[in-house]
Amino acid sequence: MARWSLGDHSLSVVKFLFSTLVCIILFTPSSSALIVDASDDWNESFLVEGGRSLLVEELSTTWCENCAEIDPYLMEVADAHGSRIAMVTYHPTDGFDAFQPPASQHRIERLELTHPGIGSTPTFIVDGGQQRIGSDSWPDVQKDILSEEVKNLNPSELAFVISKNDNDSFTASIQSFNSKGNGDNISQLTFMLAKHSQLVPDGFDNPGGSHRDRVVYGVSECNLQNNSITYSSGMLNSNIDDNSCKNGFAVTFEPVDQFSILLIHEKVYQNLSSEEPSSSYGVVEFAFRNLENNQSWNNLLIILIGFTFIGFLWKYYENKNK
């Protein structure tokens, strides 16, 4: 194999190119999501285009101590990754959680088909991959994100328009959709609503802060095979115009101070199993929330660069001592 020399030591060209690719993925901006600062006035409609984002799903509860430790940092982590990931959190209907949205429980039941036994909190799943359990599993989550990005070569192309109505509700409607050959006739389009800075009400066990982020409150699913809405919860209205999910699928939801709305192309519920890959075909997110300050972003960027640099030094050290 051809090799790249560095003094008396050498590195595999393949390893070098792969490391370079990882750096490009980490530090090159992407345009698969749109974030609008909630402190600004909303005075226009927004076109959201993409599909390449990776869906990162978290199972969490408001009473979970380990969740309380890591949750405050996850929004900054999501900001550090930018549009490369779309992170949401499901809170179960367990009788103890302070939120228990039916839409979250629906998505948990979907995960139970592909990940039997899921239930520990916090649990993270990157694009339908392995369960990563516990707050100390975050390095594995980061590794999964990088691995899936390298493999995510042909995502579906998604676009929707988000607008604010006269009564302060919001409507998201499909603008265009190209499956790129993914999941033809056996897939669905899903609008998912996640609310940010949700106040934890009194009377519930809460070892963490007063608010939680990325709580999934709304889900609406449109089957592309028969152009029907097969599930809807947490939305004021879900409808299909022109009898077409691809062109006429739209949802309206109540006024929310801060939120994310995701459009996902994924397998239908009936075609999920623990023996088949359950990764999504395409994901794009629109976020309307308060942006983390630039210093937090700069610190996280320094950390990411630092870890990458340490990785190169460690690889050099390993080769030097062979």
Residue ranges with predicted function:
Residues P102-P116, Q142-E148, A159-K322:
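Short, conserved sequence motifs used for protein processing/export or organelle targeting and
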Residues M1-S39, C64, N294-K322:
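Secretory targeting signatures
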Residues F18-L21, S120, F259:
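Short loop/turn motifs at secondary-structure junctions
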Residues C67-D71, Q100, S135-S137, P201-G203:
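Short, solvent-exposed loop/turn and secondary-structure capping segments
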Residues W42-D94:
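Local sequence-structure signature of Cys/Sec-based thiol-disulfide redox active-site neighborhoods
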Residues D79, T89-Q131, S135-P155:
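Thioredoxin-like thiol-disulfide oxidoreductase module
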Residues G51, G82, G119-T121, I186:
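Extracytoplasmic
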Residues L55, I125, T190-M192:
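Soluble periplasmic/extracytoplasmic beta-strand elements of cell-envelope proteins
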